[in-house]
């Protein structure tokens, strides 16, 4: 479920009478609050992760990363398999993660996505950097020209 996925390898436990017990209620509340803090809504944190949308699963991963102190996240084509609404939500999540002081590197072939979330855009062609621009100093046409060599 979502709680088990969120705490994977970091479960909260107590020891009583020599036995370790999971602090399920506390883990559930921490998970719920962490999701709220980053702006993600999952109706039931006891839902099986496999029943959630791709966007919801990505949100859980990002939320877990931020909650446990991650400082840099690398997202490789994070929106490739998502629908329009899920992609919009994913872009919002990237912005939320950035606002929390986490550095985010997004690898994408979608110029519009890059322009929406990037502070800097680095264009590579055939394994070489062919251009680097600050988002506020460039636009769609210039980035496409760098990509295509035009």
Predicted regions and their residues:
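Glycine-rich phosphate-binding loops of nucleotide-dependent enzymes
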Residues: 1-150
